[in-house]
Amino acid sequence: MYELRSSNEGTVVRVEVDEGQMVAEDDEIAVLDTESGRVVIVTDVPGVVRELYVEAGYSVTPGTVVALIDES
C-alpha cells in the first residue's frame, strides 16, 4: 500500500476521487488552498484508492496522509 502524503500546508478545498476508485499515475486526488494559492495533490502511483483520510475543510500539513492507494 502506498501512503499519499501532502507536501504543503493548507485547507482541503475538494477531493477529486472516491474510495474504491481506480487512479492512474498523476491523477488529481485533492485540491488545497494554501497561502500561495491553489495546489493540486496528485498520485505518484497507479492503483485503487483504499482509504481517504481527508475531506473538504480539513487542514493538512506537510506529511499528512491524504489517501492510501493499493498498487496491486
Model-identified regions with their sequence ranges:
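Short, charge-rich amphipathic interface segments used for partner binding and complex assembly
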Residues: V40, P46-T61
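N-proximal short alpha-helices
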Residues: R14, M22-V23, D33
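Short histidine-centered loop motifs in beta-beta connectors
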Residues: S7-N8, V12-D18, R50-V54
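Short beta-strand-turn/beta-hairpin segments enriched in glycine/proline and small hydrophobics
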Residues: M1-T11, E28-P46, E71-S72
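A structural signal for short beta-strand/turn segments enriched in small hydrophobics and glycine
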Residues: G20-I29, G57-V66
